[in-house]
A protein has these predicted regions:
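Hydrophobic or amphipathic, alpha-helical segments that drive membrane association/targeting
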Residues: 3-102, 184-185, 227-232
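Extracytoplasmic and endomembrane cell-envelope/extracellular-matrix remodeling and assembly machinery
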Residues: 31-38, 61, 69, 182-269
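Active-site-flanking alpha-helical
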Residues: 52, 114, 134-142, 251
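Surface-exposed patches in mature extracellular/periplasmic domains of secreted proteins
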Residues: 58-69, 81-91, 141-149, 171-175, ...
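Short pre-active-site segment immediately N-terminal to the catalytic Zn-binding motif
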Residues: 110-127
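Membrane-active amphipathic alpha-helices enriched in small hydrophobic residues
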Residues: 153-168, 175-185
Length: 269
């Protein structure tokens, strides 16, 4: 079934913020050279193109040129100030009321319509986009893959099943999450807090350099945390895709406070 296959691929993409990788997050780390041999940029591009074919065939793919061009304009403005200006990006929309965005291999960035609705300023939306762009420029997917063992693709499939189950209430999904391989997945679905902090900090730099209000990131995080607090409190920790912690918000507040203040008029279009 096309829709199910697409969700399967999207579940894999959510691995970026949730798979554990033991990297040091003291300051702003360098691009991971170890990732180059395990999962090359060419492999990332090929995988990204394959997944995009599935995305475009999904009924929730939101083909609105005006909105897509607007989001792409903001995203490319940020990417031009990123860590890897050679990386090209493609931004696309998914019709989904959930507040979310996600990074895919090869510089593909998916944005839910719910994110656009929830953002109260252009800088808030840009803060989320900058975070996802940083996942790509810092090669988090490649660094995750390089940390897997010989059965890495089997592990990815198990992760996908577990995350797919999180988005469905079907008995089949519940059975999948209870299966032996998925139970092992639970132990690995610890948040990569280092990846998230890294993406926050790189995203904040892009936000400031591109002329947005750097406080947009922390303000949106705060609102998102308030909106999801009840859901997070009742969900198994291994099914949460982003660790929205007070620590992350405090870190962003501290870093933004040290940047020169500038007034930005940025109503979202």
């Amino acid at each position: 079934h096309s829709t199910m296959r697409t969700r399967y691929f999207f579940a894999i993409l959510l691995l970026v913020p949730v798979v554990y990788f033991n990297v040091k997050a003291q300051g702003l780390p360098d691009l991971g050279e170890a990732s180059q041999s395990a999962f090359t940029p060419a492999m990332e591009r090929q995988l990204g193109q394959s997944i995009m074919k599935e995305a475009r065939a999904d009924p929730s793919f939101y083909d609105d040129p005006e909105i897509t061009d607007y989001v792409a304009g903001v995203g490319n403005r940020l990417a031009a100030r990123g860590a890897d200006t050679r990386q090209s990006f493609e931004f696309f929309m998914m019709r989904d009321t959930q507040i979310n965005a996600f990074a895919m291999p090869g510089g593909k960035i998916g944005v839910h319509t719910g994110l656009i609705t929830a953002a109260q300023s252009e800088s808030e939306m840009a803060g989320v986009l900058g975070h996802e762009i940083a996942h790509v420029t810092q090669r988090h997917i490649a660094r995750m893959v390089s940390n897997q063992q010989a059965n890495q693709w089997v592990s990815l499939a198990a992760f996908a099943i577990a995350l797919l189950a999180a988005r469905s209430n079907s008995q089949v999904s519940q059975a999948a999450i209870a299966a032996g391989p998925a139970l092992a997945v639970q132990q690995q679905l610890n948040y990569s807090r280092d990846f998230e902090r890294e993406a926050d900090r790189m995203g904040l730099q892009m936000l400031e350099k591109a002329g947005f209000d750097p406080r947009g990131m922390e303000l949106f995080f705060e609102r998102l945390q308030r909106a999801t607090r009840l859901v997070e409190g009742g969900a198994p920790s291994y099914l949460r895709s982003h660790p929205l912690t007070y620590e992350r918000i405090a870190d962003m507040q501290g870093r933004a406070a040290n940047l020169p203040y500038k007034q930005v008029a940025d109503p979202i279009e």
